[in-house]
A protein has these predicted regions:
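Short, surface-exposed amphipathic charged segments that create phosphate/polyanion-binding patches used
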Residues: 167-171, 304-312, 432-433, 482-492
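Generic long, charged, amphipathic alpha-helical segments
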Residues: 404-435
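Hard-cation-handling environments
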Residues: 246-391, 404, 439, 454-456, ...
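A polyampholytic, Gly/Pro-enriched intrinsically disordered region
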Residues: 117-122, 309-323, 486-512
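His/Asp/Glu-rich metal-coordinating catalytic cores
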Residues: 16-72, 77, 81, 86-269, ...
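Conserved acidic residues
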Residues: 9, 69, 220, 352, ...
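Single conserved hydrophobic/aromatic residue that forms the stacking wall/gate
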Residues: 1-14, 549
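Short, compositionally biased "basic patch" segments
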Residues: 208-223, 310-317, 387-413
Length: 550
């Protein structure tokens, strides 16, 4: 089954007490958010911001933020956490649960995101004032981000936490980012326990610094990412060798290597590789070449990495630390904190490495470095991470001959390349290895967090391997229990580029709601076939009286 449909598992009246609503990152890779209603509680799993091209509209919360009891965070990336300050701004006052490293990283990442919101609003308002237009408000402010951080509770890995009677969770290291986790959730209702597992972003094998993903043995229902569910990374590349060759040929041309990098995780991996390159003398003829970290967020994140409990790191990193070696520090490493320091980086022609954020080139200082280096054929722009559809990074990788930066059209003459295989996400084989660790197979796997066709392809792959799998759309709602699952409400499959006019959209939406309600009612009726006559008679009376039955 490549996408969700109206077929269901076994369903009975007790199922409607636990519901899941898919709100974001379904048939797209950003804006992760799912609402769990169970054991008398309402919890969000992640609350992320959409980045890049918006393919399917994220759905509004079906309940007010003030009615949500808490949020469970899989990891600190903004596409999983970026809406938390907005949630708080709109009335959320519950607790936010995450691992301790995730909590520390969120403290800098949410504040940084808020600064970006404020800066963009200020920039738009300057333009609006000149045009006589109405001012705009930032999505949220630094104050909102700080208020959100007050609600965080840092948790240990592998420790069960009771959130409420009948609702227990546990964080398991999933090897995607420092502090990243899968989340196990046990829901007990009417004396029956159902186990859910949210994969979070599943890490790639053999990443530097952090551990490999931990697998989980049992679950009734699994909700798993599928970012690279249609492809293989291939044999593990020689990252150090490939990076050293890129540096060598670029420096020999007299150019800079500009690396758009995620400030958290990928930047620290690059420092790990460059330390090895310098230690082994793999780049020759350029002395102690300078390496700049030009991202205040990356600088703060690097500090958090250095202060983290070594138990969070892999065996190689722990061995270096035990010898008193800092695995992400080396001669020639320079940090740029202020804007003046950032501007000075491009003031000379000394070949250098510039690592700057954001990783998809959508914001931040990287855009200034692209402006100064994209037009220079001696330079290299090196991408080291996933580039979402619609981002400037994806545009460059796809072969753009020119791009617009700060109102100017810039010719793309620099070498554009990728450090292949360097990914924080598992490929198809890694995803299959993770899900095949469940024994017995889960009752159903919900495939999420993947580009449109990738989700369908990976759901079909799982089906061919004997899993019951589907790929829900934003707005889709399922009732789930120990006996089975049933789709209560179909998600929206209208792509934004094909979105009808507002009036037509409203009419279509209302009619679709009516059709969905009818299908939902028929499904519940069919699954009560064979029930006790007394219960069926009561059910019929409820329908006759037009009372809510679902």
């Amino acid at each position: 089954m490549s996408q969700s449909d109206w077929s269901s598992d076994v369903c009975s009246s007790d199922l409607v007490s636990m519901k899941l609503t898919f709100l974001g990152a379904n048939h797209e890779v950003t804006g992760s958010c799912t609402l769990l209603e169970a054991a008398g509680q309402r919890y969000l799993i992640d609350c992320g911001m959409e980045q890049g091209k918006d393919v399917y509209e994220n759905q509004p919360f079906p309940v007010a933020p003030g009615e949500i009891d808490g949020v469970l965070v899989t990891h600190a990336h903004i596409d999983h956490t970026g809406q938390l300050p907005l949630l708080v701004r709109n009335g959320f006052r519950g607790r936010i649960y995450a691992t301790k490293p995730t909590t520390q990283l969120c403290s800098i990442m949410l504040r940084d995101s808020a600064h970006i919101q404020e800066f963009e609003a200020e920039w738009k308002n300057r333009k609006a004032k000149r045009a006589g237009a109405e001012p705009v408000e930032p999505m949220y402010t630094v104050q909102d981000a700080e208020a959100a951080m007050q609600l965080f509770r840092g948790m240990e890995y592998n420790t069960k936490i009771e959130l409420a009677p009948g609702l227990v969770i546990r964080f398991i290291d999933v090897g995607h980012l420092l502090g990243s986790s899968s989340i196990e959730i046990w829901v007990t209702e009417s004396g029956t326990t159902t186990k859910l597992v949210f994969s979070g972003d599943i890490g790639n094998q053999h990443q530097p610094i952090i551990k490999d993903p931990t697998t989980i043995r049992d679950a009734d229902y699994v909700f798993m990412e599928s970012t690279y569910g249609d492809r293989s990374h291939g044999p593990r590349p020689d990252y150090v060798g490939e990076l050293s060759r890129i540096l060598q040929r670029t420096f020999d041309r007299g150019g800079n290597v500009v690396i758009p990098s995620f400030a958290v995780g990928r930047t620290q991996e690059l420092l790990y590789f460059i330390r090895e390159i310098k230690k082994e003398g793999l780049v020759t003829g350029h002395g102690n070449f300078p390496v700049y970290i030009d991202s205040p967020l990356a600088i703060e994140a690097t500090r958090i990495f250095k202060d983290t409990d070594p138990d969070c790191f892999d065996e190689d990193t722990r061995a270096l630390l035990a010898q008193g070696i800092d695995p992400i520090q080396f001669p020639g490493l320079q940090v740029s904190v202020t804007s003046d320091e950032s501007r000075m980086i491009n003031a000379d022609r000394v070949p250098k490495v510039i690592i700057s954020a954001s990783g998809m080139c959508e914001a931040g200082r990287i855009r200034h470095h692209l402006k100064h280096n994209l037009w220079r054929p001696e330079c290299t722009i090196l991408f080291v991470g996933y580039q979402a559809v619609g981002t400037l990074g994806r545009t460059l990788i796809d072969g753009a001959v020119n791009v617009k930066l700060f109102g100017e059209t810039i010719d793309v003459q620099a070498e554009i390349c990728q450090l292949t295989g360097l990914s924080g996400h598992a490929d198809r084989e890694g995803l299959l290895a993770w899900v095949n660790a469940f024994s017995p197979k889960p009752k159903r796997v919900f495939v999420i967090h993947g580009e449109d066709e990738v989700e369908n392809i990976f759901a079909q792959t799982l089906t061919e391997q004997g899993f019951t799998a589907c790929a829900p759309y934003n707005g889709e709602q399922w009732a789930i229990g120990a006996e089975g699952a049933v789709c209560l409400q179909e998600g929206s499959r209208v792509r934004l580029e094909h979105k009808p006019s507002e009036g037509a959209s409203r009419a279509a939406t209302v009619f679709q709601r009516l059709v969905s309600a009818g299908k939902r009612l028929l499904r519940v009726i069919e699954h009560n076939e064979g029930g006790a006559n007394k219960d069926l008679a009561k059910f019929a009376d409820q329908i006759k009286d037009r009372k809510s039955v679902v």
